[in-house]
Amino acid sequence: MNKIYLRQIVREFYVDRLVSEQESADGTKTLTLTEKGKRRAISFNFGRMKLKVPDTWDGLWHIVIFDIPEKYKWARLSLRDKLLGLGFFQYQKSVYMYPHACRDEIDFIVEFFKVRRFVRYGVLKEITNEAELLLYFNLQRPTS
């Protein structure tokens, strides 16, 4: 694991408040999982993984975007297959949408394939051509 990649992961953990840092008198640093970090430190059965589907949709779209280099083609193809197998909608070649929260599962998958630096996860309130997604997932936009 290279140092730049490790720093990026640690920075993400700080932002999400998953780890805390303590510095000892001799200057060494210790990273410790916070309670939130411990709750996120979950394991999945990769082959049987399923995404939770709540009773009601909150109107938010969860998006996975990636740009995985050709030298990691196996990981790119495996990630695509996994997202489709989990029920994601392929919005574009490397853009996948899902109507429910799935950040923990996506974090696990990208770590499993070792492609975190090439994958982004986001949440959208609205997107153009939403009708196609609503039809695919058999949803109606929630009324306020």
Model-derived segments and their meaning:
Residues 1-3:
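Short helix-coil junctions and helix-kink-helix linkers
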Residues 14-16, 45-51, 77-82:
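Short amphipathic beta-strand starts and helix->beta connectors
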Residues 53-116:
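Exposed, interaction-prone assembly regions rather than primary DNA-binding/catalytic cores
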Residues 5-19:
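Basic amphipathic alpha-helical segments that dock to polyanions
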Residues 23-24, 93, 120:
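Residue-level detector of family-conserved "landmark" positions at structurally sensitive sites
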Residues 99-144:
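Long, low-complexity, charge-rich intrinsically disordered regions
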Residues 18-21, 90-91:
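Short secondary-structure junctions
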Residues 22-46:
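Accessory beta->alpha helical hairpin/"wing" motif in late/C-terminal subdomains of nucleic-acid enzymes
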